[in-house]
């Protein structure tokens, strides 16, 4: 077991009850272009086209064999584009249950499949996009091979679902998915302390337990300790529900689009786990579930998720949470003179530090305006990786990609710096800054 000591479990109220219920049915689903870094789409459909579940909506110009397939059957109702015609989302109004069939195999033959058979089925079905590389967090090139594949079966994000609850319902499919992934590379199955999961004793699968505060459950943490990456070495990672989907694909020949997500947050009337579907319309999913007022829906974690609004009002491809917060649009009178009983800080600046175990109803307010970056040891307190966070963040801010690489930027994804953004006195958002630097590093070779 690997136990980390540095990090932070955000004391936010509204944690979900770890029991799965059926969610409100949604009428539309979507693929979000923002989820796929560096992807340039070649569209295969247009508005008004009827599509089947698993039918290609677009492919990647750089890797034409990688298909991005429909998460539901119905009619393409909208293709949203932003500045410079960047793809925002492809929306499907659900209608019917037509679906494409893919290759299927008996469960006892999965361990004998070739890597080519596995790749072909994942590519044709669109489940290849469940995989992401590290460095760069992109859908991998089908011609590349990873040093290893990381399966994240632990989740320490605030308000997250317990993976063990979900996997318990789909044990056979999860084990089948691990077997299939083992045909591509060695697999690291990362889990919580004291948890036993299906398939962890399979040949080619190494189970590794992690413990400690967030980010103990992030793939970046697991990769750093088990198989670090660099300019000449890459690994792939995916979450536990995509492993289940892969197992279902290879044993049934059909896409499994069900997702169990946490519907939680301080403004949720009944925080719980809900059974919905990939790319679900979050406005419809949250209807009638929130306290009255001006609330914000976030696809993903409160630390590193994306505001779900307009063209982006759908569950992200890699997200397993719908987090809901009150909009922090009210200024507090003489807030700097208050004791801070209802505010949280990593530093000893509020009385709330004396109230151990207290949960806070966080809002979207940053509690201050942008200012200079001030290193007071807060980054080091939440960074468990063996890097120099203050120095790295400084070089990321000024855009010195050479020094950023030397200090470990290639090991990181936006979510790995989310806690640094939270504790930053200067109110910097380090995730987008990191992404800009990674894009430049990749372009410059």
From Swiss-Prot:
Keywords: Ion transport, NAD, Sodium, Sodium transport, Translocase, Transport, Ubiquinone. One of its GO terms (biological process) is sodium ion transport. It is an enzyme of class 7 (translocase). The keyword Translocase applies. One of its GO terms (molecular function) is oxidoreductase activity, acting on NAD(P)H, quinone or similar compound as acceptor. The keyword Nucleotidyltransferase does not apply. InterPro entries: NqrA (IPR008703), NQRA_2nd (IPR056148), NqrA_C_domain (IPR022615), NQRA_N (IPR056147). It holds the Pfam family NQRA_N. It catalyses: a ubiquinone + n Na(+)(in) + NADH + H(+) = a ubiquinol + n Na(+)(out) + NAD(+). Its EC number is 7.2.1.1. Belongs to the NqrA family. Composed of six subunits; NqrA, NqrB, NqrC, NqrD, NqrE and NqrF. PANTHER family: NA(+)-TRANSLOCATING NADH-QUINONE REDUCTASE SUBUNIT A. NQR complex catalyzes the reduction of ubiquinone-1 to ubiquinol by two successive reactions, coupled with the transport of Na(+) ions from the cytoplasm to the periplasm. NqrA to NqrE are probably involved in the second step, the conversion of ubisemiquinone to ubiquinol. This is Na(+)-translocating NADH-quinone reductase subunit A.
